Amino acid sequence: GHNDYMCPATNQCTIDKNRRKSCQACRLRKCYEVGMMKGGIRKDRRGGRILKHKRQREEHDNRNAGAIVERRSPNLWPSPLMITHNKKNSPALSLTADQIVSALLEAEPPVVYSEYDPSRPFSEASMMTLLTNLADRELVHMINWAKRVPGFVDLSLHDQVHLLECAWLEILMIGLVWRSVEHPGKLLFAPNLLLDRNQGKCVEGFVEIFDMLLATSSRFRMMNVQGEEFVCLKSIILLNSGIYTFLSSTLKSLEEKDHIHRVLDKIIDTLLHLMAKSGLSLQQQHRRLAQLLLILSHFRHMSNKGM
């Protein structure tokens, strides 16, 4: 019935000729304010036809709800109470911390070799060709890896693609940084392609990102980041990088976001579990968790530079 309408914002939506369909709850409230009777219809109207037309109009409104929501002003967010948690039975949410670690370690992509020919000197063109070919082949494996990240395949195909589109360069970069931890001052793009910053200089503008990647690898080394922590961080990048750029605020989209947040909580709990197992005190665990998550903002910054 009409009383079931719920304003997804603050019950103060603007209802005028152009925006009367944007929020049924506020539209109904405005009707009451100007004298419409609750629980009935005005006696001076022929009820049957009015109700029939109203029902048809509401069905049409509901069909267009997705498009309508996208036209709303950005600060009108649907209420969390509207989310039904229809993905709460996702297998990912019932995994233990150890099971998540095992799944992520098993999901790790295979090693990819570059087509580097040591007999040919680097030029800007040859370096870019090498790196883009390498990235292309890594991206194929990245898709298979993402499908094995707990909770990822529970999302719609559209949202899986969206998250990968947002995060692919950050994921490539964290993999590069992780591989390079044992090579101070160098970046290990592939087992047969280890570059120092002087070689990086041959691509215009590349040395700035090169230095940032080296600094991040140095931070990983200084913190003694473990492989289990690395796979958790990489999964967090996949799930988190695109979560705030979903195009719509429809209920379906909100349920997807809610699911992602729940999986992210599981992965963060897994990181804390790993730290507790390593013997860190509660305070040390929280500090290390914060330090690891702070590093992720640098990957976002580097990927924005790299685009």
UniProtKB/Swiss-Prot annotation:
Q: Which organism is it from?
A: Aspidoscelis uniparens
Q: Where located?
A: Nucleus
The record's annotation in Pfam families points to: Hormone_recep, zf-C4
Q: Can you say what this protein is called?
A: Estrogen receptor
The lineage, from the top, is: Eukaryota, Metazoa, Chordata, Craniata, Vertebrata
User: Family per UniProt?
Assistant: Belongs to the nuclear hormone receptor family. NR3 subfamily.
Q: What is known of its domains?
A: Composed of three domains: a modulating N-terminal domain, a DNA-binding domain and a C-terminal ligand-binding domain.
Tell me if Zinc is a UniProt keyword of this record: yes
Residues annotated as DNA-binding are: 1-43
| Binding partners and assembly | Binds DNA as a homodimer. Can form a heterodimer with ER-beta.
